[in-house]
């Protein structure tokens, strides 16, 4: 498992604990693939798990009346993050992603595509404090685009429309390490039920010897991965041998 896998699984676990169904998505092409979406997610407005005795993460701004569709990009590093050019500027890629949800008509998709290209413009995102959002007329759907910055912290960058590493880590900690025993949701069960994707992360948070949630570097160390190499990431983000345009 590499660092990108850990980042994406951490975010996926965070969404799952907030009531979202989550999957990844490959946008296919005649040769190779056009692009990859780190997470597509949907949450329904009547989701409820009262036995867990925990509120939803406020950073996600969930809705009690809307079906919430998310398109998410997870990016490491300390600089501004954006959706890949191969998604945000490609009409066919955007169309493919919307079709994957299976919730939008062809007419709705044709209306949404140019709006999505507009709201995902990096300059617009940089100047905003809110997640790019489109309401679907005549429905109770909203379509949102979340940028996830696991190597950054809200304390120093809280004005940007991102989900930060400490947002995810602190919330997951509260879910797995409640301060008071819950009547209908025990903490002792077969953790392997979380499956291969999540089990090692779950064990990190449930480790009885761990007294605090730590940070993203603590998680990297647990997975025997090197801490963030800021100098290298800066070079990549400035365009030197970057594997994906941003």
What are these regions (language model features)?
Residues 1-246:
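Intrinsically disordered, low-complexity Ser/Thr/Pro/Gly-rich regulatory segments
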């Amino acid at each position: 498992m590499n660092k990108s896998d850990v980042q994406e699984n951490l975010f996926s676990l965070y969404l799952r604990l907030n009531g979202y169904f989550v999957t990844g998505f490959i946008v296919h092409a005649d040769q190779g693939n056009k692009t990859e979406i780190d997470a597509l997610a949907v949450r329904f407005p009547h989701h409820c798990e009262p036995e867990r005795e925990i509120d939803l993460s406020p950073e996600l701004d969930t809705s009690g009346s809307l079906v919430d569709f998310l398109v998410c990009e997870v990016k490491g590093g300390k600089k501004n993050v954006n959706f890949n050019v191969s998604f945000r500027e490609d009409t066919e890629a955007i169309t493919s992603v919307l079709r994957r949800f299976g919730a939008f008509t062809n007419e709705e998709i044709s209306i949404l595509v140019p709006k999505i290209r507009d709201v995902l413009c990096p300059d617009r995102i940089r100047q905003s404090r809110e997640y790019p959002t489109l309401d679907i007329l005549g429905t109770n759907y909203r379509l949102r685009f979340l940028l996830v910055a696991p190597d950054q912290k809200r304390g120093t960058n809280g004005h940007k429309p991102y989900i930060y590493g400490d947002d995810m880590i602190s919330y997951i900690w509260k879910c797995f390490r409640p301060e008071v025993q819950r009547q209908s949701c025990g903490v002792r069960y077969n953790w392997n039920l979380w499956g291969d994707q999540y089990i090692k992360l779950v064990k990190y948070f449930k480790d009885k010897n761990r007294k605090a949630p730590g940070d993203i570097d603590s998680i990297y160390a647990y997975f025997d991965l090197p801490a963030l190499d800021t100098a290298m990431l800066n070079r990549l983000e400035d365009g030197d041998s970057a594997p994906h345009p941003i």
